[in-house]
Swiss-Prot record:
This is 3-dehydroquinate synthase. The gene is aroB. Its cofactor is Co(2+); Zn(2+); NAD(+). InterPro entries: Dehydroquinate_synthase, DHQ_synth_AroB, DHQ_synth_fam, DHQS/DOIS_N, DHQS_C. Keywords: Amino-acid biosynthesis, Aromatic amino acid biosynthesis, Cobalt, Cytoplasm, Lyase, Metal-binding, NAD, Nucleotide-binding, Zinc. GO terms for cellular component: cytoplasm. It is an enzyme of class 4 (lyase). Belongs to the sugar phosphate cyclases superfamily. Dehydroquinate synthase family. It catalyses: 7-phospho-2-dehydro-3-deoxy-D-arabino-heptonate = 3-dehydroquinate + phosphate. Binds 1 divalent metal cation per subunit. Can use either Co(2+) or Zn(2+). SUPFAM superfamilies: Dehydroquinate synthase-like. It comes from Bacillus licheniformis (strain ATCC 14580 / DSM 13 / JCM 2505 / CCUG 7422 / NBRC 12200 / NCIMB 9375 / NCTC 10341 / NRRL NRS-1264 / Gibson 46).
Length: 362
């Protein structure tokens, strides 16, 4: 088992990474020395079938536990589901010394974390991520639910007390989910580590990724995020760099309809557009043709669907939480590992987006 310590202004907490470590859940949580009068275990219906009862039984050996499974998919990050979980917490008589346990991917982590951040003005929670994608979202304390007009518009900063990342869970993921998670790994490499990106560029297919490579990806990805979050917990500065590819990515997700495209596929499109703008504005020397061919080979979409208008995407970006005073904030690269924040008027991004989409149609 490997471990990392996340250091932020508000809290220091451990991340445990290893195969099969969920089976030591009770011991790992006990080592945190939290009061934990009761536990509310929140998972989703698919994860529940594989790991829900196992973790429930392990935790129940030491604490009173209630398990709730929400529907799988981005649609669960809704106000209705948030209120349902608050009701479950109240009816189970959670108190300020209770703890919420999130077992699942990024959706469950975001939702359960937001419930924890707001119940009785904030109680403890612990993350048990089960997907490659959630190596990113489980660390850093950003928790949220969606609004019909945009992704993650209703949320808070609320750090977990620990993250228990059992890499054994990744072995059961379908290729689509592996690809989605890999996009966030690629993002971390682009913004911070050229040698890591060069390693990733050697991947020929999702199926060829070994267990050892997965563990190393998770460790490196979390290490990069930990470094950024330790310097900027509340996204006042460099933490915004972690949004590379996400401005267009979130717009695509919202416009397609949540669940119609994976987060990672949308972010892959967003990164390709960000590289295009980086080339035009900053003369970024990244070989976009090589990157596009590699991403296509791994199964990522090449372009935004033609039936989705540029105007609709701009509207979504204008509602993005990073937009300030009608000015769209974009994360660009002047080279791999060197990030710049740039502000654009909507008409500028519309022009770049139309150019990029025309390039993709050739």
């Amino acid at each position: 088992m490997k471990s990392l310590q996340i250091e932020t202004a508000s809290l220091s907490y451990p991340v445990f990474i290893g195969g099969g470590i969920r089976k030591n859940a009770a011991e790992l949580l006990s080592s945190l020395n939290l009061p934990m009068t009761k536990l509310l275990l929140i998972t989703d219906e698919e994860v529940d079938k594989r790991y829900g009862e196992e973790l429930f039984s392990l935790l129940r050996s030491k604490w009173p536990v209630k398990k709730v499974a929400v529907p799988s998919g981005e649609q669960a990050k809704s106000i209705d589901m948030f209120m349902k979980l608050q009701t479950e917490a109240i009816q189970f008589h959670l108190d300020r010394s209770s703890c919420i346990v999130a077992l699942g991917g990024g959706v469950v982590g975001d939702l359960a974390g937001f419930v924890a951040s707001t119940f009785m003005r904030g109680i403890d929670y612990v993350q048990f991520p089960t997907t490659l994608l959630s190596h990113d979202s489980a660390v850093g304390g950003k928790v949220a639910i969606n609004h019909p007009l945009g992704k993650n518009l209703i949320g808070a900063f609320h750090q977990p007390k620990a993250v228990v990342y059992d890499t054994e869970c990744l072995s059961t993921l379908p290729e689509k989910e592996m690809r989605s998670g890999l996009a966030e790994v690629i993002k971390h490499a682009f913004i911070r580590d050229e040698s890591f990106l060069n390693e990733l560029l050697k991947l020929d297919s999702i199926e060829a990724i070994t267990t050892g490579q997965l563990s190393e990806m998770v460790y490196k990805g979390i290490s990069i995020k930990a470094e950024v979050v330790s310097q900027d917990e509340r996204e006042q500065g460099i933490r915004a760099y972690l949004n590379f590819g996400h401005t267009l990515g979130h717009a695509v997700e919202a416009e397609y309809g949540y669940g119609e495209i994976t987060h990672g596929d949308a972010v892959a499109l967003g990164m390709q557009f960000a590289l295009f703008v980086s080339e035009k504005v900053l003369n970024c020397p990244v070989d976009r043709t090589k990157i596009a061919a590699w991403l296509k080979n791994l199964g990522y979409p090449e372009s935004v669907k033609r039936e989705v208008s540029t105007e609709a995407l701009i509207y979504r970006m204008m509602n993005d939480k990073k937009t300030r005073g009608g000015i769209i904030q974009f994360v660009l690269l002047d080279k791999i590992g060197s990030v710049r924040l740039h502000s654009f008027k909507a008409e500028e991004i519309e022009r770049w987006l139309n150019m990029w989409r025309l390039e993709g149609d050739k």
